[in-house]
Amino acid sequence: PPRWRQPALIARLLTDPRPVLDELRTAHGPIVGLGAGPMRLAVVGDPVALRELFGTPVDAFRWGHRFNVLGFVVGRTSLIVSDGPDWKRRRSAVQSGFSRRRLNGWVGDIVDRTDACIDGLVARTGGEPAVVDLYPVGRELVQGIVVRTLFGERLAARSGEIAALFQTAQDYLESPAYRQVPHPLPIGRRARVRADLDALRAIVDEQIDHLRREPSDDPLDLLAALLADGSLRDEEVRDQVITLLGAGLDTTAASLAWLLWCVALAGPGLWERLRAEADDVLAGDGPFDASHLARLDLADRCMREATRLHPAGSFAPRMAHVDVSVGGYRIPRGTLVLWSAHLAGRDPAAWTDPSAFEPDRFLHVRPEQKALADLAWVPFGRGARNCIGFALAQMELTLILARLAQRLDVAPTTDREPRAVGMVVNRPAGGVPLRVSRRP
């Protein structure tokens, strides 16, 4: 773009990214350079270029750079602001917490908590048709799952308090005030954010102290698993847990909202197909495990299609530590690379009718298109720095959708798609009001 337009484009990109990303691709293609000097950006949304980017050694990039706004919230030892040997050690410890056995154990808990959420919704509406914003309903469900997953049953009852403390910081990250450079002094709103973060860290520190005194035998408690691993200091454990809380709360809740909106708008035929699948797979009272999840093929395709269209993050940053080559372009050291799941997920070369919600597209992708489509589905990233909790997030979205279809009727109240808002998390403005009733 012309240099005189670039400051305004960058400002819009950091406040309302999706329209700007679409404009840049239409005008200049899926790889675009912006800015100069210390504010040099490269937007990368081409699927083939992303394969090259994700395949570049992680040491060629830095995540603990001055533009990583999340470090303020998650702590200085967090995975998402770590580099080099420290990152590798922390990543290894946290990755071990997402073992196959632990993921398998979380399946039943997700179904049980979804049932409790549905019971509460039915009690609230009397089972009669009512318009309900399922975004906050889903968010409360997700926060219960995430807090129980991270902290075990002891703190599960405090999930609302924990989520509210984190939400203060999340809202601040999305505000224009946070993106001031230099950042404002710790007064007013920023001071309140710090106070809530301090309160959240105190809760986690107290739970760590408790588990040091009384080790947990709960096989599903991720915090207990990190402490038992022994390779991280207590501060590191705390920062990773808060990172996982942030990564698993707002992002999954927003993805669930978009998923429910897409499926509801697709019409009753898709909902009936989801119900038939769930009736077959999730019959009875359980126990349910990963073998049941693997059979929810249609629900999984709906999850994949909704996250393709509406990834939780429209772009993610990494700073080039050395000169790198991506998609035939030289990206100089010091460039902030913004790779975009939004652009890749709507790439017209990878997807037929890319703006349409078509879960069955994954069944009949043309052979010549399949490899490109595989590269273009990156809502959870790819490579060594992908989303570490992607398996849990996909599990939650798939199981929640299947159980809702099994027990409720859901229909849209309008065919107007919600406006996507948010720089850090892509969420639907105004929520997702849907007509909900108990299954006949």
Feature map (PLM): residue ranges:
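Cytochrome P450 I-helix active-site segment
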Residues: 1-3, 107, 111, 164-167, ...
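N-terminal membrane-proximal hinge/A-helix region immediately C-terminal to the signal-anchor transmembrane segment
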Residues: 1-77, 82-85, 89, 111-116, ...
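Cytochrome P450 proximal C-terminal region
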Residues: 25-26, 114, 118, 166-167, ...
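Alpha-helix/helix-capping structural signal
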Residues: 47-48, 101, 145, 342
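Cytochrome P450 heme-thiolate monooxygenase catalytic core
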Residues: 62-70, 86-88, 102-254, 273
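Cytochrome P450 catalytic-core helices
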Residues: 251-277, 390-408
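Conserved cytochrome P450 K-helix/beta-meander segment immediately N-terminal to the heme-binding cysteine loop
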Residues: 339-368
